[in-house]
């Protein structure tokens, strides 16, 4: 039986979204505590249920830590960018927590990780959104990331 693996950076992105979600949900600003909680979950594959036997999950710890740290360092700028992309009838205070977490991490990677092509960032986080959010929110994530990529003149 062959072993399947998911890209380590893809898992790191999912884990970073989960860490930022935990930060918002628990109002916990202890970045090290949050990172340790999420890392311990991923490092113990036995705690991940519903996986095929031959699927191996591991994440790029360095990419995960970099994303979480960058979000914490730039959280106010990221929220300002997110809020500026809402339509007039949308109240930032009513944005679903998971959507805000995903946008914080994805916009952060788009703006502060220039070695990752914008097209890769947009595709990765749209795929993550597809697994976590509803259809309207998926389209919103794709649209916001595309606009931000164009605004910041990165090639997509």
UniProtKB/Swiss-Prot annotation:
One of its GO terms (cellular component) is cytosol. It comes from the Bacteria. The keyword Transcription regulation applies. Keywords: RNA-binding, Transcription, Transcription antitermination, Transcription regulation. GO terms for molecular function: RNA binding. InterPro entries: NusB-like_sf, NusB_fam, NusB_RsmB_TIM44. Transmembrane segments: none annotated. It holds the Pfam family NusB. GO terms for biological process: DNA-templated transcription termination; transcription antitermination. The keyword Transcription regulation applies. Belongs to the NusB family. Involved in transcription antitermination. Required for transcription of ribosomal RNA (rRNA) genes. Binds specifically to the boxA antiterminator sequence of the ribosomal RNA (rrn) operons. This is Transcription antitermination protein NusB.
């Amino acid at each position: 039986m062959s072993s399947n693996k998911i890209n380590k950076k893809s898992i790191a992105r999912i884990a970073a979204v989960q860490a930022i979600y935990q930060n918002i949900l628990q109002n916990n600003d202890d970045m090290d505590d949050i990172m340790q909680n999420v890392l311990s979950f991923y490092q113990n594959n036995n705690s991940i249920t519903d996986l095929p036997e031959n699927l191996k999950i591991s994440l790029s710890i360095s990419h995960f830590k970099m994303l979480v740290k960058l979000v914490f360092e730039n959280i106010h700028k990221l929220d300002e960018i997110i809020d500026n992309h809402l339509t007039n009838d949308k109240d930032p205070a009513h944005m679903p927590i998971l959507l805000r977490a995903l946008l914080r991490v994805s916009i952060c990677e788009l703006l502060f990780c220039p070695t990752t092509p914008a097209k890769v960032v947009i595709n990765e986080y749209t795929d993550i959104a597809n697994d976590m959010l509803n259809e309207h929110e998926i389209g919103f994530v794709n649209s916001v990331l595309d606009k931000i990529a164009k605004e910041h003149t990165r090639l997509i």
